[in-house]
């Protein structure tokens, strides 16, 4: 086939061998010589890139950040068979972007039943204490992520009908506000301690509740949990030598 510009093909073996802490698709696209940070290619803003899954667009249409849709991957990296990164191709079938284009192809079932189950976990204690020989001082920000998932694929009718499913769930406990009030009015930025006294914060909270009936709730170091759930199902039907049908359903929920 005639080339329509610079392209990098990324195989399943490449995807498996690339180290990725965040399990992000953008970590894999860096295998392209033009790949930069996030979805940036050849120096262009990441929001000008185009991302497709099996030919369907999955773009950040609102455009306030360079993240993939939903603030993360629309599908699990374990559901991807191969990828291609193209840089401003002149193929008329690939349009509506001026930076790079990422084409992801999802896995499909075969005549052999295959499956996997996995758990990934990371937290702030897995980080080192030194950067370029300098010790990192201060309180360590909470950075935890636990991911559970599975894949399963195989034949429904041998040589004719196949299925593949993938489900993944991630939990990310965070802290909405790390700053705390001080006891003596002395601030300590490294420990996230404000110069505002705890007793003053308590007085303000009590005043607002008595005057307006409004409960301020906690004003210091209170937690929140983010979650991400992905599900993908695909069915492939070999109708005959000239006709094939593929149906794919995917669902993503961020909270």
Segments predicted by a language model, with ranges:
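Residues on the lipid-exposed face of transmembrane beta-strands in outer-membrane beta-barrel proteins
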Residues: 104, 150-154, 233-237
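Substrate-binding clefts and substrate-entry loops adjacent to catalytic sites
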Residues: 123-138, 142, 206-214
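Short sequence motifs at beta-strands and strand-loop junctions characteristic
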Residues: 94-96, 140-145, 223-227, 239
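Periplasmic N-terminal accessory/gating domains of Gram-negative outer-membrane beta-barrel systems
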Residues: 1-108, 127, 133-136, 149-151, ...
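Transmembrane beta-barrel strands of outer-membrane/channel proteins
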Residues: 117-123, 165-169, 247-251
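Outer-membrane beta-barrel channels and translocator barrels
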Residues: 107-109, 157-159, 240-242
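Outer-membrane beta-barrel domain signature, strongest for Gram-negative TonB-dependent receptors
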Residues: 170-255
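Residue-level detector of the transmembrane beta-barrel scaffold of outer-membrane proteins
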Residues: 52, 82, 112-116, 162-164, ...
